[in-house]
């Protein structure tokens, strides 16, 4: 491609709303243009990157035995009602009506449609296993779309769905997709981790996320540098930090703590380590009849509640945080001084594993401006009703696999695989005849990749102050040839054109900038766009018999003989 025939429209400044590097740089590089909140036009450079990502995804999905189809964006509400997700999904599901006032949705995902296809198309075990996939537009009505393509409302995803005759087969399909995802992200040239994850609203019993490592990532990834253990912080198991409970060494005492409503303030006031304090978190679970059940969750003062773990405990499904009225009713005190000793009304008490082994701890006294010091289980209050893992792990916690300590880094989720089992096939009655001629329910898996999100994630991981630094596999162009003096020197033009044609003949995706721009402007624009390799052809260099090669990641250019320019360019590309 020649730049004079292409649409390039870079900007010096990013829009004020662009908070992160990928949003800023994609806008400045002319890759996207905002149409509405969370909705973007993919301009030629942006679309080129997307198509390259789709190509790699498609190749690996086909190689793994998946079969491509294309399901509609608009789906009838009846299928969502049948699965139960019409009521469950919430405001992110964009509901629409046609001219006949029939309900439809703009698809955020396609489990219902693919299961409907399966129940109509799969009759016999002889047709199994099957794995269908599509690459399609999705829409989720995010409350606050932000970060450009990272959290937009309209986006492109690859969804795959496997169907098997039994659980063992479904697990094999899961493993095949897991391996395919590893290959996809390796080919994309991204640093990533596959981590165990919660299944969330999709459901199922087994799940892994594929996270691109980036400091701006919204997710926290827990991993063990000494082993293969890795999990999303939502799922990472937090051990008890005390193996046994020490004997009481202090008497229980109510001490004044005026204005100290936080554990940090209490610890400072009493000159104690924060780890000696206990924080109280009050949850409520609404009941079909009568008042809500109230639960008191206890964590060490320096730990944070993991809401995913809490929601999985018996009796806490669908919990909410208690209202101030409910707190006053059960504790006789406002938040900030709550504790498990002498509550005004009975509550269910759940202690984190570490809290259950603490002795002589500090907790709220259920009296404003007072805390108890020297509190002990069994002596001053009953043993907790339940002991459970309630907290987020922290850096340095022992690894659950017993092999060293945990580290934490940030990541951007770009892929997710789920073992669904029969969650959707049972709800939609997707059955087949087994080898005994009897009806059996299909076992399912689903596997998603955020195609457009990968674009943003790749930039978050690969950029500097000058612009984007694309991995070669997904760069809009692999090489840009920058002739200095295009309009003045026939030798420069001929040399640049010859190299351009030679690279094209060898299948290299190359751009020739024939706009006769000033060198500084031309170089800055291509550094912003992030093409991996630049070849500079100038009259001064040609007089010395050389051209210059500069990889986007490198600070210095290398001079190579003109007659070796093609070979050296190809060799340099192979290193990128």
Curated annotation (Swiss-Prot):
EC number: 6.1.1.15
Subcellular locations according to the entry: Cytoplasm
Domain of life: Bacteria
Top enzyme category: ligase
Pfam families tied to this protein: HGTP_anticodon (PF03129), tRNA-synt_2b (PF00587), tRNA_edit (PF04073)
Keyword annotations of the record: Aminoacyl-tRNA synthetase, ATP-binding, Cytoplasm, Ligase, Nucleotide-binding, Protein biosynthesis
Gene Ontology cellular component terms for the protein in this record: cytosol
Gene Ontology molecular functions: aminoacyl-tRNA deacylase activity; ATP binding; proline-tRNA ligase activity
InterPro entries xref list: aa-tRNA-synt_IIb, aa-tRNA-synth_II, aa-tRNA-synth_II/BPL/LPL, Anticodon-bd, Anticodon-bd_dom_sf, Pro-tRNA-ligase_IIa, Pro-tRNA-synth_IIa_bac-type, Pro-tRNA-Synthase_IIa_type1
Biological process terms in GO annotation: prolyl-tRNA aminoacylation
Reactions this protein catalyses: tRNA(Pro) + L-proline + ATP = L-prolyl-tRNA(Pro) + AMP + diphosphate
Role noted for this protein: Catalyzes the attachment of proline to tRNA(Pro) in a two-step reaction: proline is first activated by ATP to form Pro-AMP and then transferred to the acceptor end of tRNA(Pro). As ProRS can inadvertently accommodate and process non-cognate amino acids such as alanine and cysteine, to avoid such errors it has two additional distinct editing activities against alanine. One activity is designated as 'pretransfer' editing and involves the tRNA(Pro)-independent hydrolysis of activated Ala-AMP.
UniProt free text on domains: Consists of three domains: the N-terminal catalytic domain, the editing domain and the C-terminal anticodon-binding domain.
Family to which the UniProt record says this protein belongs: Belongs to the class-II aminoacyl-tRNA synthetase family. ProS type 1 subfamily.
Record text on subunit structure and interactions: Homodimer.
Listed name of the protein: Proline--tRNA ligase
Organism whose genome encodes this protein: Bordetella pertussis (strain Tohama I / ATCC BAA-589 / NCTC 13251)
Upper classification of the organism: Bacteria, Pseudomonadati, Pseudomonadota, Betaproteobacteria, Burkholderiales
Gene it is expressed from: proS
């Amino acid at each position: 491609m020649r730049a004079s025939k292409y649409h390039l429209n870079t900007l010096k400044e990013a829009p004020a709303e662009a908070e992160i590097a990928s949003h800023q740089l994609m806008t400045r590089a002319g890759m996207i243009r905002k149409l509405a909140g969370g909705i973007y036009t993919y301009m030629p450079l942006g679309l080129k990157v997307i198509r390259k990502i789709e190509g790699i995804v498609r190749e690996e999905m086909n190689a793994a035995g998946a079969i491509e189809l294309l399901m509609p964006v608009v789906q009838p509400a009846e299928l969502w009602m049948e699965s139960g997700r019409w009521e469950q999904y919430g405001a992110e599901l964009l509901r629409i009506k046609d001219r006949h006032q029939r309900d439809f949705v703009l698809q955020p995902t396609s489990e219902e449609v693919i299961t409907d296809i399966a129940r109509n198309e799969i009759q016999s075990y002889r047709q199994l296993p099957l794995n269908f996939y599509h690459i399609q537009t999705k829409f989720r009505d995010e409350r606050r779309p932000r970060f450009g393509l990272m959290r937009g409302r309209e986006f492109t995803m690859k969804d795959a769905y496997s169907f098997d005759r039994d659980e063992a087969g479904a697990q094999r399909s899961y493993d095949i997709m897991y391996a395919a995802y590893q290959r996809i992200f390796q080919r994309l040239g991204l640093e990533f981790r596959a981590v165990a994850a919660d299944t969330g609203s999709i459901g199922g019993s087994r799940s892994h996320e594929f996270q691109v490592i980036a400091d701006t990532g919204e997710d926290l990834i827990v991993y063990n540098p000494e082993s293969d253990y890795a999990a999303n912080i939502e799922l990472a198991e937090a051990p008890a930090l005390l193996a046994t409970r020490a004997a009481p060494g202090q008497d229980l005492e109510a001490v004044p703590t005026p204005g100290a409503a936080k554990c940090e303030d209490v610890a400072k006031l009493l000159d104690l380590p924060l780890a000696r304090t206990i924080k109280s978190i009050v949850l409520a679970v609404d009941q079909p009849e009568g008042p809500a059940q109230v639960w008191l969750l206890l964590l060490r003062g320096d730990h944070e509640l993991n809401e995913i773990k809490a929601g999985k405990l018996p009796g806490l499904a669908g919990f909410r945080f208690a209202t101030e009225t409910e707190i006053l009713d059960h504790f006789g005190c406002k938040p900030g001084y709550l504790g498990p000793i002498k509550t005004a009304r009975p509550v269910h008490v759940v202690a984190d594993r570490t809290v259950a082994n603490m002795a002589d701890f500090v907790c709220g006294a259920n009296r404003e401006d007072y805390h108890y010091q020297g509190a002990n289980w069994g002596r001053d209050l009953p043993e907790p009703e339940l002991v459970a893992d309630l907290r987020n792990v922290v850096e340095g916690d022992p690894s659950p696999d017993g092999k060293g300590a945990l580290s934490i880094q940030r990541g951007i989720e770009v892929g997710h695989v789920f073992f669904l089992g029969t969650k959707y096939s049972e709800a939609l009655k997707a059955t087949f005849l087994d080898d005994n001629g009897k009806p059996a329910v299909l076992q399912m898996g689903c596997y998603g990749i955020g195609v457009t999100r990968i674009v943003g994630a790749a930039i978050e991981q690969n950029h500097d102050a000058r612009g984007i630094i694309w991995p070669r596999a997904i760069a809009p162009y692999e090489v840009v040839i920058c002739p200095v003096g295009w309009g003045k020197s026939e030798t420069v033009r001929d040399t640049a054109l010859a190299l351009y044609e030679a690279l094209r003949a060898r299948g290299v995706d190359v751009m020739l900038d024939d706009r006769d721009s000033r060198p500084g402007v031309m170089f800055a624009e291509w550094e912003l766009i992030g093409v991996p390799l630049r070849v500079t052809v100038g009259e001064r260099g040609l007089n010395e018999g050389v051209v210059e090669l500069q990889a986007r990641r490198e600070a210095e250019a290398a001079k190579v003989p003109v007659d070796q320019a093609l070979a050296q360019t190809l060799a340099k590309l192979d290193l990128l």
